[in-house]
Each structure stands twice: as structure tokens, then as C-alpha cells.
């Protein structure tokens, strides 16, 4: 997006009262608070949708002030096919600042990094401006890559591409004193998928990301130690990189200030932060949807999403989280079935659901607000000018300041990481309830799906893995920015550690993806187990009813027998008893089903009075025949029901198809190709988790997730008066 107003430098700026799409300072809002607040208008979900839309556009047009998180992430993914175009309107402003530097050199103007040394040794002076820039790049090439046999010390190429894009965007604003041709060359590298190799560590993101950015400059100047990676993963030297990018002008001889312009910025930290926040925002929405599915499979009570509760708390993140969950649960077949169960048997489960379900909006809401605020902070940062000095052509001066201080990156990434850890903690609590038969309202222990629970331990290993993920995530929640060390002869005595914090947040996002993938597979397992439960319960009810009619209705001489009145109470037992508590051996003498069915018959016999003394009217004497007939019939019917379900011919269809959460279930089961996990199958849980994790990393879960919410109008349901 290009802006219509001009600065005194001849480039776009908001100083004269214009308005940037991302809210840069304007004449009517000199402190930028109003536009910062305005940027948070609307729902978080709508913002994420816009982010995804920007990610999917085929071209990123750089003008200096309108770069977005989604665009950075698109370019970071080298296989996305998205191309970068530079706004031609920026050329004049870039040239003006470059010309000013050369003119000032000719006039003998003393400028930091142009005629002086660097940092704590800026008292030194030189007239060899080009040689000074060459030395700057040489001494900053201080990173370590290692041999790669055990571990990689190279910055991920996606982060490097993000940094290249952000740095070009910054330099386009025309305050940096660099030739436009250098920016065009970096853009050609991006468009030809040629990525310089940058060290993973070695920056404190103040004065900018000096060390890693110097390796981009090293490639541009043809330093022999510089390397790049091509589109097919091949390692390239500078000559090969230039040839593949179609740059025929040869390596650059840096002019005064150009080396400093390339390295004195926060682009590596902010570029990685942008890609991290793209993922974090999507994972935040995913956590809301998964919490709603968790409520469905746990037979949760949906009143925890009622708008009045959240309206009275006032926090927008909480209100939106509750509204999203409310939307998914509204009309859910699981919710309807659970409500019926709660009405007929109110004592079967606690009056209130546990905190991991009932307070999930209150827990997730603040995390969403933190992630959203961090997103806005980073979006401002990737559109900021971070050099020192800044070239102000309009006032004919170089401004010496500290925009290279990447504190917005360090702070926003620390905050984001804490939010991610909190989301992971909730997810682990929900997962722990889901696999525990003491809490999960009738699902089998460990979500075992097989016939023999003694040889099927379901998600037990997964719960251990989830505990490990969660523990590491909680450790990563510790801040990075409170570990600042004074650097560079105490000139850089406070520094942001922006890239370090971004790297740790990228790790946290990756771990939350592991947790989300595992949890999603577990939820799909629970959905299928509820389907199995419903079909098995229906089979048991029909079989008990059939046996009761056959054995208890008539006496030996064909007369009506007093035991015929037992059937209704026998069916109540089946309705109230958790199927998975007995279904592996339903007719065992110690089975809770058989014990309670027998107790019904005993109770009726005790009420039968004197008729128990007569063998033709005794209910006690019917118990043996009833149990024998049930033992003959029930195991066979249970196996038939299981087999029919496994073959896709279940008597009762899966309720999930009637729910708004179905798109996520569908992609996991049908498109990704997972299925009910049982001990009888060779396939391990980890194999299924891996499939979903890979799909999540490839962005394949985004559309199904949004499909769950496609009918949401962005508002809570009206507060009902009944």
C-alpha cells in the first residue's frame, strides 16, 4: 500500500498530518496512542483472517510503512511462491539520503559511522569512508556456524528471509543513506530463493542485529567467507549467488554509511518475531476451538460461555473467547445429549465442570490480548526506521539516536512466550482430564479404544509426552530480557536481546504445536469413543430389553409373571452405567453392569412379598435364567456392534457430523488419514501425532479451523431471559 503524502526527504511519511495504514505518527496524533488503540478495533478472529489473507497474496509490495505480519511470514516460507516488489515511488527518497551522505563526505561533515569509528571507539576519525564500511563488515563477521554434524548454528533460512524483507522495508523509507540498487539486489535474492547463511547466535539486538546482518552485507560485497543456500538447498558462494539471482553488475563496493545501513537495524529479531506471531495468533484461535471440542466430548455444561458472565468481567479477550466457544457449542449434538443426561440424572457428575473447562475463556482471554498487543508492537517495529544515524535531508543533518534498540521485540516476545506457555498449561490440564476416567465422564481410562484394556494403554505415553512438553514450555516462559549483559566496552550497556527472545518464542510456538497436535488427535479419539459408547449402550439396552421380555415376561405355564415389571428399571441401569466400565467383559460376575442388574431383580423380588414362596411367581428364581440368557447373547451382540462400527456401518451415526467442530475432525480423520487408536493395531500414537503435526506446520489446519467459525457473526449470543 502506498501513501499519498510526501516528507521533506521526498519519501512517504506521516509527519505532515497523513495517516499510515499501520498507524505511524500523524500531526493529529503526535504520540501515536490513538492509532495504536484504533488498530485493536474489531475482533481478534477477524484480524487473524486478515493476516491469513495477506499471507496468501501472490505479491508483497514494499513501500516502507505498510508491511504486515502475514506478508513477512509469506516471504519467510521460501516455497510459497510469493514475490517481492519495491515501490518505485521510494527510489527518489532513498537516492536523496544516499546523495546526502556522499555530499557530506565531500564537504568534510563529521558523521558517526561515516567518518568516525564505531561504538565506544567513535572518537577515531577517517576520510576513507568506503574502507571503513568494509572493515565494519569484516569485524562484525564474528559468528560461528560449526560443521553441522551434531547441531546447526545457522539461523533458519525462514528467519533470514524475514530479516531481508524487513531490512529492505526499513531502508526504503529513505533515512539510511544507501543506494536503491542494493535494495533491488536483496529483493532479487528473495525472489530467486537465494538465502545468505547467518549465524544463529551472536546478536544482542542493540545496536541492532549487527553480527547476523553483517553476513548479508558480506554476500553483497563478495566476502570469501560468505555463503548462501539456493532454492534446491545447494550451498552457493557469492559469485554463484549473484549469477543465480541474475545480478550482473558484480559485487558492491560499499560507499560511506552503506555498511552501517545494512547492519544497524533490528530486522533479524523483528522478522523472526513476525513469523512467530503469525503462528501464535493462529494457535490462540485453535486453543479456543479445541477448548470447545473438549467441552463437547466431556459432556460439559455450556453455561460457562453465557455472555452475561463475561460481559460483567469486561475483558475483550475473555468475551471473544467465550463467544467463540459459545458459537461452537450452540446447537451441538453433544451438548444436547449432555443436557438430556444432566436432566435425567443430575447426580451423575458434579454440578460444575472443573476449571480447565469452566474457566477456559477467563484463562485464554488475557493470553489473546497479550498476543494481539505484541502483534501490533512488532508490526510497528517492522515498519520502523532503526538506523543510527538517521539522515534527515530536509534539515540537512544526521541525527544520532538509538532506534536500533530492539526493546519492543524483546518485551513483546517475552510476553508472547508467557502467553503461549499459559495456553499450553491449559491444554495439558484439559488433556489430563480427558485421559483420566475419574474425570472424563464415562470415557475409558487412557482413551483406550480396543477390546481388551489389559492389552491397550491408549494415550498413556502421550500424557507423559504432554507433561514433558508442558514442563519445557513453562521453563521457556521465563523472560530473556532480564539477562542483559553490558557489551562493547560498556557502550552497549543496555541492550534488548530481541533476537534471543524471538528464538526462544519460536521454540515455544513449536512446542505448543506439538501439544496442539497431540491434543487434537486425543479429542478425535474421544469423539470416536463417544460414538462407540453410544452404539454399545444402544446394543446393551436392546439386548437387556430383549432378554427381559424373553425370560421375565411369562411364567412356566404361559401366564404373565411378576418379573415383567423389572424391564424398565433394568434399562435405567444400562442408561446410568458408564459403558466402558464393563464392556470389555460385560457378563462377568464382578461386572458393575451385572451386579446392578442383579440388584434390580433382587429389589423387585423383595417387593414381591408372599409370591416369592411360590416357584411359579418367584422373581428370585428368574435371576439365574435371566443372567444365563444375557451371558449367551450379550457378548455376541457387543462384538457385532463393534464390528459394524469399525466397518462404517454403525447403527447410530457419529454425532460429530452435526456439530460446528466437524471440519477439524474431518481433516484429521479423512484428509490426514488417522483413525481410532487401539492396542490391537500396530500403528503407534506417535505416528498419528506426527501426521497432524506436519499438517499443522504446513498450514493445512487453518481452513478447517476457520470453517468451524464461518457462521459466527463476531458477537456473543443474546442473553436469554428464560
Swiss-Prot record:
Pfam family, one: Lyase_aromatic
One cellular component term from this protein's GO annotations in UniProt: cytoplasm
PTM per Swiss-Prot/TrEMBL: Contains an active site 4-methylidene-imidazol-5-one (MIO), which is formed autocatalytically by cyclization and dehydration of residues Ala-Ser-Gly.
Top-rank lineage group of the source organism: Eukaryota
Residues involved in (E)-cinnamate binding: 264, 352, 358, 388, 460, 488, 491
Cross-link (5-imidazolinone (Ala-Gly)): 206-208
Keyword Cytoplasm: yes
Role noted for this protein: This is a key enzyme of plant metabolism catalyzing the first reaction in the biosynthesis from L-phenylalanine of a wide variety of natural products based on the phenylpropane skeleton.
Subunit and interaction comment: Homotetramer.
Family affiliation: Belongs to the PAL/histidase family.
Protein name: Phenylalanine ammonia-lyase
Gene (name only): PAL6
